[in-house]
Amino acid sequence: MANNNSSNELVVPGVQQALDQMKYEIAQEFGVQLGADSTSRANGSVGGEITKRLVQMAEQQFGGQQYGQQQK
């Protein structure tokens, strides 16, 4: 039987509100009006920026160490 874990499932309770806030802040910075009437390019630019910022936050949290390496 297939494992029904969605890759979009949030693993931290309550994080959806923070992600939504980040999305709307970035959209405002980029001058993008989110919604069905926006182009996929405009909406995608917001999603791409969210990804960049989340990766940057994770890198800072790990102190720049590469994934899989033990901190010495």
Swiss-Prot record:
GO terms for biological process: DNA topological change; sporulation resulting in formation of a cellular spore. The record marks E25, I26 as: Cleavage. Keywords: DNA-binding, Sporulation. It holds the Pfam family SASP. The keyword Disulfide bond does not apply. It comes from the Bacteria. GO terms for molecular function: double-stranded DNA binding. SASP are bound to spore DNA. They are double-stranded DNA-binding proteins that cause DNA to change to an a-like conformation. They protect the DNA backbone from chemical and enzymatic cleavage and are thus involved in dormant spore's high resistance to UV light. Belongs to the alpha/beta-type SASP family. PANTHER family: SMALL, ACID-SOLUBLE SPORE PROTEIN A. SASP are degraded in the first minutes of spore germination and provide amino acids for both new protein synthesis and metabolism. This is Small, acid-soluble spore protein 1. It comes from Halobacillus halophilus (strain ATCC 35676 / DSM 2266 / JCM 20832 / KCTC 3685 / LMG 17431 / NBRC 102448 / NCIMB 2269).
